[in-house]
A protein has these predicted regions:
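Non-catalytic pre-domain segments flanking phosphatase-related domains
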Residues: 1-30, 34-42, 49, 59, ...
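Mg2+-dependent phosphoryl-transfer enzymes with acidic/Ser/Thr/Gly-rich catalytic loops
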Residues: 2-9, 21, 47, 185-270
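Conserved Rossmann-like nucleotide-cofactor binding loop
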Residues: 33, 72, 206
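Glycine-rich phosphate-binding "P-loop"
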Residues: 34-44, 171-179
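Active-site phosphate-binding/coordination module
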Residues: 45-133
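A structural signal for isolated positions on well-ordered beta-strands in alpha/beta enzyme cores
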Residues: 63-65, 86, 139, 199, ...
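Short hydrophobic/aromatic-enriched beta-strand-loop microsegments
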Residues: 84-91, 150, 219-226
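Conserved acidic, metal-coordinating active-site core of Asp-based
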Residues: 128, 132-214, 219-223
């Protein structure tokens, strides 16, 4: 990350990706990066051409992955199984890699507790609060009813204390997850093993751990670039956590497309 915290593109050097693609990785979030953020999450779809760009990236780079808080089955339904592309869902709890589904076994034992929490909140939630079961996690969305966010966070905190689940806050949501150490940062660290350079594209609170890991990996000698994507759910910390801030998913996809084509993406109008 740039020392001045500005996210200025003047600090960004893509030459390792262009000159040494076989030791480089390209990792990206899904919502707000490959797809527009929409009020109804069920209506979010990849931008036109996104799947082709991801496929082209996989033809060029050593590691390409889509890393999301969504269930991996959802990612597969939107993007398909693209050869040599790893789909990581639920912040790392599950993934599709080399055509095979893998689930973190240590989290599976929490299934019944999460289901019980979903049943409980469905009976108590105020009108307008959206309840989403995401496999082994439970999310309460207040995007359509912002006045319910405080209630959701308080309920989640109490449920976390009584069950051992972990409450994780988003800008307009709160998520209950199994108490297993995983996030987008742990995913980035795992996927970057053996690479000389790695970049990550993200827009939300859940992407901040990935950017923090990139900062540490850089201090250890790896070349890293953190790309922030402006979105309605952009956290205040995003601008100071990234090297480059692009204007929405369309510009993020254009940058990814440049990398896939092996063309120089700088200066990029960020």
């Amino acid at each position: 990350m740039p020392d001045d915290g500005t996210g200025s593109q003047e600090h960004v050097d893509w030459s390792p990706w262009l000159g040494q693609p076989l030791t480089a990785g390209v990792l990206t979030d899904y919502d707000g990066t490959l797809a527009l953020v929409v009020e109804d999450r069920d209506q979010a779809v990849p931008l036109p051409g996104a799947r082709d760009v991801i496929s082209a990236l996989a033809d060029r780079f050593a590691v390409v992955a889509v890393v999301s808080g969504r269930p991996v089955g959802y990612l597969e339904s939107q993007l398909g199984r693209i050869p040599r592309v790893t789909l990581v869902g639920l912040y790392g709890l599950e993934r599709i890699e080399n055509g095979e589904l893998r689930v973190m076994n240590t989290a599976a034992q929490w299934d019944e507790i999460v289901v019980s929490a979903a049943t409980s909140v469905a009976q108590a939630a105020p009108p307008g609060l959206e309840i989403e079961m995401k496999g082994m996690t439970l999310v309460l969305h207040s995007r359509r009813a912002p006045e319910t966010l405080q209630w959701a966070r308080q309920w989640a905190a109490e449920r976390a204390r009584s069950t051992g689940l972990v409450a994780q806050h988003g800008r307009s949501s709160v998520e209950l997850l199994p108490p297993v150490h995983f996030d987008k940062g742990t995913v980035v660290e795992e996927l970057s093993a053996g690479l000389s350079s790695v970049c990550f594209f993200g827009d939300d609170v859940g992407d901040l751990p990935a950017f923090r890991v990139l900062r540490r990996l850089r201090s250890e000698g790896k070349t890293t670039i953190a790309v922030g994507v402006e979105s309605p759910e952009q956290p205040d910390e995003l601008a100071n956590a990234v090297d480059l801030l692009v204007r929405g998913p369309e510009q993020a996809l254009a940058l990814l497309s440049s990398l896939a084509d092996g063309t120089w993406p700088y200066p990029f109008d960020g």
